[in-house]
Amino acid sequence: MEKPFIIAGPCVIESAELLDVVAAELKRISEQFDVPVWFKASFDKANRTSIHSFRGPGLERGLQMLADVKTKYGLPLLTDVHESFQAEAAGEVVDVLQIPAFLCRQTDLLVAAAHTGKTVNIKKAQFLSGDDMRYPVEKCREAGCREVWLTERGNIYGYNNLVVDFRNIPLMHRWVDRVVMDCTHAVQRPGGAGGKTGGDREFVPQMALAAKVFGANGFFFETHPDPEKALSDGPNMLYLKDLESLVKKLL
């Protein structure tokens, strides 16, 4: 049976110093437990609730900062692309291109990501079922992508809330070999904190353990040394100090 893998890092690139702190801990966890870890961070958060919210350093500077992490720590990289023109440049740096949930039906974006030859991780939209994800997968494969992952991150449940139907994990296994559980975005309260997203990080461990039972291969955690001071998604991010104990439970 394949060992679980971890995707983790801060929501957005805030500074080189933050990337160093998080990457060093992820490298330590990866080596200590012999678990594959992908370092994740976004160079641009293009879908923030408010126009005044921090978005990140942008494509060119952000990719250079991610490349520095890979050189220094040897961790494979994952980042998200929001527009088709970003895919080629990002694909030259990272190992996995991620398609945001809200954009998972955007054909041109999926095709552009597929054309890079890199693995594509498609996050399931908050308004789709696991069964619906056959079609984004088909778009990537028709465009030549050799490896596609799918990620569960919950579904819209009324206003400012999400609920996870864990049946989506085995459903998505019909279309791909690797299904990931996004344990931190699944506990979001979208737009529920007055112009920004809230969240309930105390439920992150339960999300991870339930997803393990349902057959998830990978586990996605946004993590930060001090989530209360994070510039994006703080309320749902896992404290970096708590990541090791949770990873141990998943192995």
Report each predicted region and the residues it spans.
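Active-site glycine- and acidic-residue-rich loops that bind
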Residues: 11-24, 123-134, 153-171, 189-208
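Active-site-adjacent loop and "lid" segments of alpha/beta metabolic enzymes
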Residues: 51-60, 98-103, 159-166, 186-213, ...
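N-terminal amphipathic alpha-helix/helix-capping segment at the start of soluble metabolic enzymes
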Residues: 1-7, 64, 251
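Glycine-rich, proline-tolerant flexible connector loops at the mouths of alpha/beta enzymes
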Residues: 6-18, 38-59, 223-233
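Hydrophobic faces of well-ordered beta-strands that scaffold small-molecule active sites
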Residues: 6-9, 37-41, 77-79, 97-99, ...
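N-terminal active-site wall of soluble small-molecule enzyme domains
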Residues: 41-100, 105-109
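Conserved anion-binding
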Residues: 45-49, 103-171, 175
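Alpha-helix-loop-beta-strand connector modules within alpha/beta enzyme cores
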Residues: 24-33, 52-78, 113-119, 169-180, ...
